[in-house]
Regions:
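Active-site region of PLP-dependent enzymes
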Residues: 1-83, 117-118
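Short alpha-helical functional segments enriched in proximate histidine and acidic residues
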Residues: 64, 106, 171
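Conserved PLP-binding active-site segment of the aspartate aminotransferase-like
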Residues: 81-92, 121-133, 145-159
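C-terminal/domain-terminus segments
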Residues: 159-171
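FAD-dependent oxidoreductase catalytic-site/capping-region signature
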Residues: 58-59, 72, 81-108
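Conserved PLP cofactor-binding pocket of PLP-dependent enzymes
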Residues: 9-18, 60, 98-138, 142-148
């Protein structure tokens, strides 16, 4: 079978998963250690300032997001988020689809289900072992289907964050 056929098979057999993040086998992230170390060390001198900017960006995002549609009451004290996390307050597949269409239309990179592409218990590699255990976690399942994250970069202009919130709130 070709890679496309294998991928299509996983997508067909797992309609509850985001097709961009179907993990068939347990694995781990492998990154080049030396280059990562050089880049990381070069960024240390800007770490505190970048963290302040990320916190300010997150405050801007959460304060402008419509709390009647999206969860905004996250505990953020002491944290520095690399991403804007947003989750629909209520399950709404039509709104979810409009959110994703709008983000794609405006070339906003996002990941549904938050880090790792959603509820890992739904992924083929764990479902083989755990069966339907995922059903016992309704909050995780809600985030799986109705939550996203968008990168929170220190160079991100406040105006873009405000425009993003206007787009999301207008849906």
């Amino acid at each position: 079978a070709t890679l496309d056929k294998i991928r299509d098979s996983y997508i067909t057999n797992h309609p509850d998963l985001n097709p961009d993040f179907i993990f068939a086998f347990p694995a781990y992230n492998v990154r080049p250690n030396e280059i990562g170390a050089v880049i990381g060390r070069s960024q240390l001198k800007r770490l505190d300032e970048n963290n302040k900017i990320r916190r300010r960006n997150l405050d801007c995002f959460l304060s402008r997001l419509d709390p009647s549609k999206y969860q905004t009451d996250f505990v953020v004290e002491g944290s520095c988020n690399y991403a804007f996390t947003f989750v629909l307050k209520e399950p709404d597949t039509a709104l979810r689809d409009r959110v994703e269409q709008t983000l794609r239309k405006h070339c906003v990179e996002f990941r549904r289900g938050l880090s790792g592409g959603g509820n890992q218990l739904r992924k083929p590699y764990l479902r083989k072992i755990m069966g339907n255990e995922f059903e016992r976690y309704p909050n995780v399942n809600h985030v799986h289907f109705f939550g996203w994250y968008i990168g929170n970069y220190p160079g991100l202009a406040q105006g873009k964050i405000e425009s993003l919130c206007q787009l999301l709130n207008g849906l």
